[in-house]
């Protein structure tokens, strides 16, 4: 049964495979190779135990299916004729190995200050993922903008290459600018950074930053200011496209049901997978 499943998926075109699992075949093969290399390094002759029911190729498919569709472990388990606890272990193990391989890691905020690779223009934005109502400290996660409990992810990307440089996650209640201050992200003086109106006041931290002009209670925007905001929005729109590409994985767009402490790991991993597709010249559509 599993062999026929793998064969069926391999017969899909590249576009069909992406629609099914959220990544292209080339990215999938790189993920499989990364997991195999980590497993080969960790295995020793003294280790004993039952053989896994799924091959590494199948385990990666299960993980991609979980991220892409975000069905429960039980429902995915019935598709693969496995228990939900086995599916849970497969997903967690695969995520851990992908990170350990080093092939799916972001550059990190230090790259923003690295003289050799500083980006010319960066775009920064915060996206939110709804979560189930917490049993304790609900106020910490309630987003006034959304009207429900959320987790926030701050993304910093290179405008030219569309590569995500770093990610920082926080609770839904905090303001976008507060999340920026907690993240301790700093830009090189020569880097131009573009943000939305949620980052008013960022000029105190980086003078080469641009945010939209806001109208006040007693003053409307001039035509020149409106044109400025329109031009800035065109430059900043790339970060919205990146958010959309990440959220084809329903684990980031649907209500997040898992432990919150694992959310940041998954956002970073999916961001690195997105970067991987850019790097091999097959940017997610």
Annotated model-derived regions:
Residues 55-69:
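Short, amphipathic alpha-helical "recognition" segments used to contact nucleic acids or chromatin
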Residues 48-50, 221:
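Arg/Lys-rich, glycine/proline-spaced intrinsically disordered segments
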Residues 32-43, 70, 98, 246, ...:
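Short amphipathic alpha-helical segments enriched in hydrophobics
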Residues 56, 73-285:
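Short, well-ordered secondary-structure "scaffold" segments embedded in the functional core
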């Amino acid at each position: 049964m599993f062999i026929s499943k793998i064969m069926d998926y391999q017969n899909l075109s590249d576009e069909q495979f992406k629609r099914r699992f959220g990544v292209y075949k080339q990215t999938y093969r790189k993920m499989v190779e990364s997991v195999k290399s980590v497993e080969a390094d960790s295995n020793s002759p003294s280790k004993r135990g039952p053989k896994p029911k799924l091959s590494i190729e199948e385990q990666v498919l299960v993980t991609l299916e979980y991220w892409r569709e975000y069905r429960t472990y039980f429902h995915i388990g019935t598709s693969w004729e496995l228990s939900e606890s086995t599916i849970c272990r497969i997903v967690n193990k695969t995520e851990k190995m992908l990170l350990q391989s080093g092939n799916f890691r972001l550059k990190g905020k230090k790259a923003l200050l690295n003289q050799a690779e500083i980006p010319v223009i960066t775009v920064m934005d915060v996206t939110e993922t709804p979560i189930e109502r917490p049993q304790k400290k609900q106020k910490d996660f309630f987003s006034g903008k959304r009207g429900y409990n959320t987790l926030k992810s701050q993304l910093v990307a290179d405008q030219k290459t569309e590569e995500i440089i770093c990610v920082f996650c926080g609770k839904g209640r905090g303001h976008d600018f507060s999340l920026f201050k907690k993240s301790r992200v700093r830009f090189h003086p020569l880097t131009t950074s573009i943000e939305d109106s949620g980052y008013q006041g960022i000029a105190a931290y980086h003078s080469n930053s641009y945010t939209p002009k806001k109208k006040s209670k007693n003053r409307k925007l001039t035509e020149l200011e409106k044109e400025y905001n329109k031009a800035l929005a065109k430059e900043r729109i790339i970060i919205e496209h990146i958010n959309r590409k990440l959220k084809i994985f329903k684990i980031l767009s649907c209500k997040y049901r898992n432990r919150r402490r694992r959310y940041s790991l998954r956002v970073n991993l999916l961001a690195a997978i997105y970067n991987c597709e850019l790097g091999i010249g097959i940017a997610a559509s």
